[in-house]
A protein has these predicted regions:
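Accessory nucleic acid-recognition modules appended to NTPase machines
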Residues: 1-86
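Generic low-polarity alpha-helical segments
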Residues: 2-8, 13, 117-119, 136, ...
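Polar/charged alpha-helical tracts
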Residues: 15, 21-24, 66, 124, ...
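Short, surface-exposed, polar/charged, turn-prone segments marking secondary-structure boundaries
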Residues: 34, 117-119, 128-131, 163-168, ...
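Conserved catalytic cores of phosphodiester-cleaving nucleases, focusing on short active-site segments
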Residues: 52, 56, 86-110
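Structural motif
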Residues: 80-81, 93, 128-129
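Catalytic cores of nucleic-acid endonucleases
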Residues: 96-98, 105-158, 183
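Domain-level recognition of nuclease-like catalytic cores that cleave nucleotide substrates
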Residues: 138-199
Length: 199
């Protein structure tokens, strides 16, 4: 299903639920508003992940399908039975390099967002099975920044660069992941819990 259609359907369902008098009676106003906010945020997050993954896949299949591999990655490590994942992995098979991505519909830098990207066992697994991890990135809706060797890139900027890279003769991944970004330290959070907004 198209991302726009998914969003239209989910928005209509959330609105119907919000207008349902029985649900209003069961839930307090704060609970209802928090639920609606979280549901909207959840849907937009999934859509952003799917758009980024699909556009990256299409671009690198167009450039050289034998050289580049793009996928989601979710595994359980054998050595410690730990579940780890990346929203996207981009592999340059020719160079033996990997790039790991988390995609977040958020404008906040939250330390928990990078727990898998900082997992040394996971990074070793990637090095051994896909190619040396060259860069770890979070694509999100905030300003570009770099924190603890993890690059935070604005998702809209990434998609614009992706469009340019797809039309460039002999493109390089580094053109897409330009690390010349704001390295100032924004406000950091340790969790991603949000307070309910009053509607």
């Amino acid at each position: 299903m198209q991302p726009g259609m998914i969003y239209a359907h989910s928005t209509a369902l959330i609105k119907n639920l919000a207008d349902d008098s029985m649900w209003k009676d069961i839930c307090g106003i704060a609970d209802r508003n928090l639920f609606i906010l979280r549901a909207d945020h959840f849907v937009k997050g999934i859509l952003l992940e799917n758009i980024i993954l699909a556009e990256t896949y299409k671009t690198f299949q167009k450039i050289d399908p034998d050289r580049y591999y793009v996928s989601q990655l979710s595994i359980t490590l054998r050595n410690n039975n730990q579940h780890v994942e990346a929203d996207m992995i981009l592999v340059d098979k020719q160079k033996g390099e990997s790039y790991l991505f988390e995609v977040k519909y958020s404008n906040q830098i939250v330390i928990d967002q990078t727990k898998h990207l900082r997992n040394t066992d996971f990074l070793e697994y990637i090095d051994e099975n896909f190619g040396k991890v060259k860069s770890r990135l979070v694509l999100y809706t905030g300003a570009s920044s770099k924190q603890n060797d993890v690059l935070y890139l604005n998702a809209a900027t990434y998609l614009k660069r992706l469009s340019i890279v797809s039309n460039t003769p002999r493109p390089e991944i580094k053109q897409l992941l330009n690390e010349n970004c704001n390295t100032s330290k924004p406000n950091l959070k340790t969790t991603s819990r949000k307070k309910p907004r009053k509607l």
